[in-house]
């Protein structure tokens, strides 16, 4: 849909890619619900621009059907783009509480991408991950478990720890504290990951320890 709520075909979207654009990134609203459209538009955009850089990138909760996910990853692999998994939580019950669904498929899909595709192009990174540090829910134990899971495939997979900002149903929570973020950073490094960083550092607070 456009800003006027008019449906746009994959062909129209592909034609709208400006000649100066070097990356198409699907995020901020998971692309899973409209993957067939996004995949087709991406294929057409690459076909229309064969002699210049045009990377296809994705940020996803990892819940897509494996058949569609493989198509997503292939587009990123071939174009020089990447796919980022938002690994919300390790504990399944916590994941259901926060997201309303199990994380089983997300973890299975991450493992599939890491084993089937990552060896084809370790650099620049094809597969990256992130976790939102929700105060009172996602602590260093959760991050440690997630980081150990990632590290078993490749300790060089980039991992971002993101500061939480109170919004919507969680408007009563504080922003992530600096001490919370640093504990999680240390936990991820201890798990063996070598490329960990804290994102959204401007949001970090001293609201709790």
What are these regions (language model features)?
Residues 178-209:
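A cross-taxonomic marker for long C-terminal extensions/tails that follow the last structured domain
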Residues 3-173:
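Conserved AdoMet/S-adenosylmethionine-binding subsite of the radical SAM
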């Amino acid at each position: 849909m456009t800003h006027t709520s008019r449906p746009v075909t994959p062909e129209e979207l592909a034609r709208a890619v400006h000649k100066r654009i070097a990356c198409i990134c699907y995020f901020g609203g998971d692309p899973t619900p409209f993957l067939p459209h996004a995949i087709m538009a991406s294929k057409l955009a690459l076909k229309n621009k064969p002699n210049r850089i045009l990377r296809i990138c994705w940020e996803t909760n990892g819940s897509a059907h494996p058949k569609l996910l493989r198509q997503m990853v292939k587009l990123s692999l071939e174009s020089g783009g990447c796919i980022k998994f938002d690994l919300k939580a390790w504990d399944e019950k916590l994941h259901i509480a926060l997201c309303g669904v199990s994380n089983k498929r997300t973890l299975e899909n991450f493992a599939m991408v890491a084993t089937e595709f990552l060896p084809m192009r370790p650099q620049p990174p094809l597969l990256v991950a992130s976790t939102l540090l929700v105060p009172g829910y996602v602590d260093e134990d959760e991050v440690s478990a997630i980081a150990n899971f990632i590290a078993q495939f490749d300790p060089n997979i980039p991992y971002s720890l993101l500061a939480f900002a109170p919004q919507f149903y969680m408007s009563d929570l504080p922003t992530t504290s600096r001490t919370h973020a640093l504990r999680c950073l240390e936990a991820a490094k201890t798990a063996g990951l070598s490329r960990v960083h804290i994102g959204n550092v401007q949001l970090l607070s001293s609201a709790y320890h």
